[in-house]
């Protein structure tokens, strides 16, 4: 089985790695993540922070050799939470023009995330290592019920850069409104993050987003019993893949947190279990290699 897993992961792309630096505790930095990914045969990874643009992190580390040689390429992006000014077109413009590949709409700052965590106080989301001002809700809707004017400006920048628009942790109605506007503006690459975690999407929601051209990303940390984010067994992941189709699905680790499995270890574990369940190698490879690569490639 180990050889089969290694073969499937050869050329894999992880669009969802959480390294240091971060105000949330992390066990690896981008250099560590790249080294681990290279040892597992990965082609590329994207590093993410809920609090700052990781694009400049990647550029700074590139001066010391990151992205040199045959190892995996490392890319960054920006998440539109309070620390970067929320729906800030200038932050997006900077991140994309400096080489960023993903813009995550609000994650920890989305009203959905804030409400979900208030309703589930025992949810094991990482605790801040430094005391920050409380996250302010970053809503894409204005008082008139329509999208705020900053949203199309941000989407235009994403379209111009041919970058990835990611849902973040928004509610289904917000994702639909943003993705519909994105399609009209010309955004070609769209990704929904962990639809059943915080977002609380249905299969019908996901099918709607797929009809707009989006891929559905499932976070492996949700299905790994060694992870603090473990919420569902493998049956749930398989059901989602069967409902939406492997051709519209991607797998990302969503890992890097202290005390959680390493990203590549979780990939090996969950990929092995999917293969052991009888999922065709071609379908698994499509979700870990082909689909995320197609989204990421400039």
PLM regions: where:
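Hydrophobic faces of well-ordered beta-strands that scaffold small-molecule active sites
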Residues: 11-17, 45-47, 75-78, 103-105, ...
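Extended substrate/RNA-proximal surfaces in nucleic-acid metabolism proteins
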Residues: 85-192
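Short acidic/histidine-rich active-site segments
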Residues: 246-263
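An N-terminally biased module of ancient metal coordination in phosphate/nucleic-acid-related enzymes
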Residues: 1-72
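Distinct, well-ordered alpha-helical segments
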Residues: 57-61, 92, 172-186, 202-210, ...
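Mid-to-C-terminal alpha-helical segments outside catalytic/metal-binding sites
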Residues: 264-298
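Active-site mouth loops of central-metabolism enzymes
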Residues: 13-28, 76-86, 141-146
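Active-site beta-loop-alpha junctions enriched in small/polar residues
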Residues: 18-20, 50-52, 77-83, 106-110, ...
């Amino acid at each position: 089985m180990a050889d089969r897993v290694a073969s499937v992961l050869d050329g894999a792309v992880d669009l969802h790695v959480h390294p240091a630096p971060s105000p949330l505790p992390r066990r690896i930095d981008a250099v560590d993540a790249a080294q681990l990914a290279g040892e597992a045969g990965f082609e590329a990874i994207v590093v993410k922070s809920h609090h700052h643009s990781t694009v400049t992190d990647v550029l700074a580390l590139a001066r010391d050799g990151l992205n040199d040689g045959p190892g995996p390429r490392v890319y960054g992006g920006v998440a539109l939470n309070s620390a970067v000014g929320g729906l800030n077109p200038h932050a997006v413009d900077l991140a994309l023009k400096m080489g960023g590949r993903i813009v995550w709409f609000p994650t920890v700052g989305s009203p959905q995330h804030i409400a979900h965590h208030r309703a589930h106080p025992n949810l094991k989301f990482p605790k801040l290592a430094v005391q920050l001002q409380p996250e302010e809700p970053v809503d894409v809707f204005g008082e008139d019920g329509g999208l705020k004017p900053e949203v199309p400006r941000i989407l235009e920048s994403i379209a111009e850069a041919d970058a990835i628009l990611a849902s973040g942790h928004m509610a289904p109605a917000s994702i639909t409104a943003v993705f519909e506007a994105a399609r009209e503006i010309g955004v070609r690459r769209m990704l929904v993050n962990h639809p059943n975690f915080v977002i609380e999407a249905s299969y019908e929601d996901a099918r709607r987003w797929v009809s707009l051209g989006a891929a559905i990303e499932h976070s492996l940390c949700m299905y790994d019993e060694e992870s603090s984010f473990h919420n569902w067994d493998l049956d749930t992941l398989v059901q989602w893949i069967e409902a939406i189709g492997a051709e519209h699905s991607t797998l990302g680790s969503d890992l890097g947190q202290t005390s959680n499995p390493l990203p590549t270890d979780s990939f090996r574990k969950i990929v092995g279990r999917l293969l052991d369940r009888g999922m065709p190698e071609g379908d698994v490879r499509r979700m870990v290699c082909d689909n995320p690569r197609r989204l990421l490639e400039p």
